[in-house]
């Protein structure tokens, strides 16, 4: 997995995709213009899947492609030392820098978050995006570790946060 910063320009997206040797790109409506700008450079190297309502002509429709897929988990053996994800720095001093994380590191992060927040299966965690950054995602891992509910916040205003906490009965924010 290689989550990308929603603020990246087309050139930064192109740079990160090539550096990570990406085979498949999933993107939503907010990325259409920036992905379209680099299609001539990337379309021969990777599959492009659009996740949204109106799929652009240069991509495949994710929902249509997955409509008849099996719900069975794929039989893929994963070792703790296998590479799991590449996260990128913000790129404030130039192009983003890649940080490679292994499964062991992500599993340990999930365990530590669950311990830190004393998360139980009955908790409800409010996950505040953006998810391209390890900060929000690593906090979310504690609820994944315990099998508790997580709510992905839509918006970032105080009102949206209070509304989500109230309506979803969030116990960890």
Predicted features, each with a name:
Residues 21-24, 40-51, 124-126, 151, ...:
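Conserved helix-loop-beta element of the AMP-binding
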Residues 16, 25, 27-36, 55, 65-66, 89, 154-159, 168-173, ...:
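Adenylate-forming
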Residues 1-26, 98-100, 149-155:
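Short beta-strand->loop structural element characteristic of the AMP-binding/adenylate-forming
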Residues 107-124, 132-172:
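Conserved AMP-binding/adenylation subdomain of ANL enzymes
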Residues 24, 32-80:
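ANL superfamily adenylate-forming
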Residues 25, 83, 89-92, 125, ...:
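Conserved S/T- and glycine-rich ATP-binding loop of Class I adenylate-forming
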Residues 67-88, 95, 118-124:
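Conserved pre-ATP/AMP-binding loop-to-beta segment of ANL
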């Amino acid at each position: 997995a290689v989550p990308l910063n929603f603020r990246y320009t087309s050139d930064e997206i192109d740079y990160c995709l090539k550096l990570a040797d990406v085979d498949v790109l999933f993107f939503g409506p907010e990325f259409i213009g920036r992905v379209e700008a680099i299609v001539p450079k990337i379309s021969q190297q990777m599959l492009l899947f659009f996740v949204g309502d109106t799929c652009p002509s240069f991509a495949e429709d994710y929902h249509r492609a997955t409509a008849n897929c099996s719900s069975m988990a794929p039989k893929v053996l994963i070792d703790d030392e296998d590479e799991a994800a590449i996260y990128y720095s913000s790129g404030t001093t130039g192009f983003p820098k890649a940080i490679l994380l292994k499964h062991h590191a992500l599993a340990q992060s999930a365990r530590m978050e669950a311990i830190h927040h004393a998360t139980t299966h009955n908790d409800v965690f409010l996950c505040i995006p953006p998810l391209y950054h390890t900060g929000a995602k690593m906090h979310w891992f504690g609820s994944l570790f315990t099998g508790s509910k997580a709510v992905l916040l839509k918006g970032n205003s105080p009102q949206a946060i209070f509304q989500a906490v109230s309506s979803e009965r969030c116990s960890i924010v």
